[in-house]
């Protein structure tokens, strides 16, 4: 497909070049083009005071994705390269993981597998309908959508990547039920999560027969796992499959490095740019060394063939 964009990042400093990414800026300008150009000028000037929005500006306004690797988990290309077909995972050992920091917006569940040198992540999210309506225009009709880019919650729902929950909160039992359902297909050995909401979730998971591991110091784990995660992205050893929601989560992560070089995974924007799926992935990576490239169903088939 033909994409109008800047040829290089440094072209953004000359507003005359913006026409490359926005053909409507070719003279004479329409009334709408004049209004949009003024808006983009204001956004560009704001970058002087707050450069943290530069990645979003370059992607949204100049159609040129750029990545500040001092602030992001991986480059745009590395994140996009997670879009590879999932191998056959049925019967394989998996680490269950979840992020359930808030009952009122998002929750993410996941299963981490090892396939040779690759980390394969299968995930599902739950989103509260009222939150999706307010911040992403979930219930709007297509004719009512504004030009501002929202996360396409309804599209992701239709693709089975998430479920929208119409209630006052996301019920903890909903999360537990997802893992119970997955247990029929995969060998879930443990479920790991940080300590947020685990006072509620842990008894429910244990009652369902799962072994639960709680990460009590998530920031220390971020720092511990950052080199492994960054290396896995760089070497294309992470597979999310056809899952734009998971890539959205990952792209929303802000990497904060302290004076000692320790890294913490935060959000680039607190409200709309969610990271729940990525945080669940980090929890899974905490126990990744326990994973084996092993198929339980194959082992059971061999046992059935033995004559005792």
Where are the model-predicted features located?
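Non-catalytic, compositionally simple segments
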Residues: 1-95, 104-106, 124-127, 131-166
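Metal-dependent DNA phosphodiester-chemistry modules and their immediately adjacent helices/loops
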Residues: 1-23, 206-294, 306
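Beta-sheet entry/capping signal
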Residues: 1-3, 11, 92-96, 106-108, ...
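Mg2+-dependent endonuclease catalytic cores in nucleic-acid-processing enzymes, primarily RNase H-like
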Residues: 129-260
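Acidic, low-complexity intrinsically disordered tails
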Residues: 297-308
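Acidic, metal-ligating active-site segments
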Residues: 103-117, 277-279, 283-284
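Flexible loop/turn segments at secondary-structure boundaries
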Residues: 9-13, 68-71, 102-107, 117-119, ...
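Flexible, glycine/threonine-enriched loop-and-boundary segments that flank and lead into catalytic domains
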Residues: 69-97, 181-187, 192-193, 200, ...
């Amino acid at each position: 497909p033909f994409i109008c964009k800047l040829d290089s990042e440094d072209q953004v400093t000359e507003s005359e070049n913006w026409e490359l990414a926005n053909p409507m800026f070719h003279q004479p300008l329409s009334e709408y083009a004049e209004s949009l150009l003024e808006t983009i000028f204001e956004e560009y000037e704001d970058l002087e005071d707050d450069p943290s929005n530069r990645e979003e500006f370059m992607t949204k306004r100049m159609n040129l994705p750029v990545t500040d690797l001092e602030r992001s988990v991986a480059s745009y290309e590395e994140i996009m390269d997670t879009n590879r077909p999932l191998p056959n995972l049925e019967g394989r050992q998996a680490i269950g993981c979840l992020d359930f920091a808030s009952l009122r917006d998002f929750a993410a569940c996941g299963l981490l597998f090892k396939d040779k040198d690759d980390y394969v992540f299968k995930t599902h999210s739950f989103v509260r309908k009222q939150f999706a309506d307010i911040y992403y225009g979930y219930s709007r009709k297509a004719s009512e959508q504004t030009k501002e880019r929202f996360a396409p919650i309804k599209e992701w729902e239709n693709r089975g990547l998430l479920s929208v929950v119409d209630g006052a909160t996301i019920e903890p039992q909903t999360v537990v039920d997802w893992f119970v359902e997955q247990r029929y297909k995969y060998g879930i050995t443990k479920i790991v999560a940080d300590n947020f909401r685990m006072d509620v979730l842990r008894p429910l998971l244990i009652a369902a027969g799962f072994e639960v591991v709680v990460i009590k110091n998530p920031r220390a784990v971020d720092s511990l796992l950052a080199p492994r995660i960054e290396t896995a992205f760089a070497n294309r050893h992470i597979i999310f499959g056809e899952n734009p929601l998971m890539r959205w989560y990952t792209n929303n992560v802000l990497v904060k490095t302290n004076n000692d070089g320790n890294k913490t995974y935060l959000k680039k924007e607190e409200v709309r740019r969610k990271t729940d799926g990525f945080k669940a992935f980090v929890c899974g990576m905490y126990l990744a060394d326990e994973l084996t490239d092993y198929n339980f169903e194959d082992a059971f088939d061999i046992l059935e063939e033995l004559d005792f």
